[in-house]
A protein has these predicted regions:
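Active-site regions of oxyanion-processing enzymes, predominantly non-cytosolic
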Residues: 1-5, 34, 101-102
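Metal-dependent active-site segment of extracytoplasmic phospho-/sulfohydrolases and closely related
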Residues: 1-17
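Beta-strand elements within well-structured catalytic alpha/beta cores of enzymes
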Residues: 3-8, 40-42, 64-69
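C-terminal cap/loop subdomain of S1 sulfatases and analogous C-terminal strand-loop tails that border
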Residues: 12-32, 49-53, 57, 62-138, ...
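Conserved N-terminal phosphate-binding loop of PLP-dependent enzymes in the Aspartate aminotransferase
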Residues: 41-44, 176
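Second-shell loop/turn segments in exported
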Residues: 52-54, 147-150
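Surface-exposed loop/edge segments in extracytoplasmic proteins
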Residues: 139-144
């Protein structure tokens, strides 16, 4: 009756190159494209999850705390605000709409990485600076689409992601990392 979850928090080191579907995929830990954040998520829950089942819905780490509350039978306090949703219905194979896009606020404080914000769905990705990608055809995000020349489908996706990205508010920190700023400025 125990739920086992295996997941990683990021892609592989940039020193590692893997192969997927006959294509070389360089490690992308710390980067914001697919190989940097699309990671395996494997779950086993005897009697609850059908053996061999596969689900390609979008999930993110915000979903794990509500999931663990749900599995443990703990009611979420009304004053506790959570962005995530329980994955229990998905794990049990229920056909529900979970998420059709995910928001990421990437603001690394530990290394010389550039902060970023973006919203993505299963095909499209929009960054706060306006870069827009068809990730089905450009998984490494090398060629941003010209947003003045989008077809109807791409324009609809852009509009949806732009509205959602803008709705999150907030701002990014300075582009200098704490390593560049020095430890004393971090502690002040």
């Amino acid at each position: 009756d125990t739920l086992f979850i295996f997941i990683s928090d990021n892609g592989t080191s940039r020193l590692i190159t893997s192969r997927m579907n006959g294509v070389e995929v360089p490690g992308s830990k710390g980067l914001t494209h697919d190989a940097g954040h699309h990671v395996p998520f494997v779950a086993q829950w005897p009697g609850k999850i059908e053996r061999g089942s596969l689900n390609m819905d979008l999930v993110d780490f915000n979903d794990f705390f509500p999931t663990l509350l749900d599995v443990a039978g703990i009611e979420k306090p009304d004053d506790l605000l959570l962005d995530g949703k329980s994955l229990v219905p998905l794990l049990k194979g229920q056909d529900i709409a979970h998420k059709d896009s995910v928001f990421i606020h990437y603001d690394p404080q530990w290394f010389a990485m550039v902060p970023s914000r973006y919203e993505f769905d299963k095909r499209w990705k929009l960054y706060y600076d306006g870069r827009f990608f068809d990730t089905n055809n450009d998984i490494r995000e090398l060629s941003p689409l010209d947003i003045t020349a989008l077809d109807v489908r791409a324009q609809a996706a852009y509009d949806k992601l732009k509205q959602r990205l803008d709705s999150h508010g907030g701002k990014l920190s300075a582009t200098k990392s704490h390593l560049e700023l020095g430890i004393s400025s971090v502690l002040e």
